[in-house]
Amino acid sequence: MISGAQQYRDKFAVRALVAHNDVAVMIEQCFLVSPQYVCMICEEVARNLKYKLVLMDKNNIQVLSGMKDACVLSALDAVDMVVSTMAGIARLQPIFSAIRVGKKILLANKETLVLSGQLFMTEVYKYNASVLPLDSEYNAIFQNLSVIYQKKLGQVSLSQYGICCIVLTDSGGVLYKITRTKLFKITPVQVYIHPNWSMGLKISVNSATVMNRVLEYIEAHHLFNVSSNEIEILLHTQTIIYATIRYSDGSVLAHFSTPDMKIFIAYAMAYLNKIKLNNISTYSKQYEIYNTYCGNNTLNLDILDTKNYPCLQTAIDASNHSQDSVIVLNADNEVTVEAFLCEMIAFIKIPNFIYRIMNTLNHFQEPSTIDDIIYIDHCIKETEIRYAIGN
């Protein structure tokens, strides 16, 4: 996103940047795009940032702090587009502030819709905001939809537009060929090394357990207004086909791409236009595309076995049950993954912990506000799950 704003300064200007506590990255981005405002959620960190920016002759940038200021920035009149990339439950408040003044939301994380579900989409309709997914699989689906459907995202059913099913693909993660015996000894470093994507530690673990795709399954339910029998997840280790749409007349549309997030970011930034970000491969002839993607091999798609990926069925059951179950699942997974990264539990035990906690701690009421969502998330993360893992 930052590189796109740099490359197309005549089209995009960054008004504000918001982060939690990473001063070094914020300073770097301030030099790259010169925002008018920056906000650090932690007040002490904001003071440190302001001091360093003044020393670097960047005292023209106004430094703010706290969640309240983050919400103000996301609703600024001068802002047309808000990119949601913040991690954690805190991301919800600034995004809802942007929605309530009708902003265009570029959704880069899965958890926003996973946590807030129908509440999020209801607010989007109510305030005439719009949503553009940045996540590769959903961006791929979105690109294959008609503009009419895109404009009514989440409000209409697939069948109204002749679509019978959307198909997500999953690489199977870096461990998909590893035997069960060896999984007991898998370390966080081994999970981190993915053959096709460069990802953070948590996302790498979620990829290996297929929880990434699980969250996307839940996200699809709200974003595209689809039922469980209108979504399929297939194993596709080559990571070439990101998603397909199956139409009622028997035709199938697929999105092919190299594993480069810049392609999906460029599409969302310049929606209904096309721009090319630097360092993205292009192909002058059709056969070059075919040879690059297929070569002498076939494109492999297979059923994703829930026996090998038990998190998948647990999540499907949670999404079919209730929104509070989904919030419990997300918090449950975050703490369990953290336990693995800290080497408190074995990798193979992750699905067991998630399943056990889902079946013992799922006793909350259906959330109707952001505060309800935050309360459930807090209860699971700070008390019950930590106790369960510790014992």
From Swiss-Prot:
Metal-binding found in the keyword field:
yes
Binding residue positions for 1-deoxy-D-xylulose 5-phosphate: K110, S136, E137, S171, H194, S207, N212, R213, E216
Q: Which GO terms describe its biological process?
A: isopentenyl diphosphate biosynthetic process, methylerythritol 4-phosphate pathway involved in terpenoid biosynthetic process
Q: What InterPro entries is this protein classified in?
A: DXP_reductoisomerase, DXP_reductoisomerase_C, DXP_reductoisomerase_N, DXPR_C, DXPR_C_sf, NAD(P)-bd_dom_sf
Q: Which UniProt keywords apply?
A: Isoprene biosynthesis, Manganese, Metal-binding, NADP, Oxidoreductase
For this protein, the record's Pfam families field holds: DXP_redisom_C, DXP_reductoisom, DXPR_C
Q: Which GO terms describe its molecular function?
A: 1-deoxy-D-xylulose-5-phosphate reductoisomerase activity; manganese ion binding; NADPH binding
Q: Which coenzyme or cofactor does it need? A: Mg(2+); Mn(2+)
Q: What does this protein do?
A: Catalyzes the NADPH-dependent rearrangement and reduction of 1-deoxy-D-xylulose-5-phosphate (DXP) to 2-C-methyl-D-erythritol 4-phosphate (MEP).
Q: What is this protein called?
A: 1-deoxy-D-xylulose 5-phosphate reductoisomerase
The organism named in the record is Blochmanniella floridana
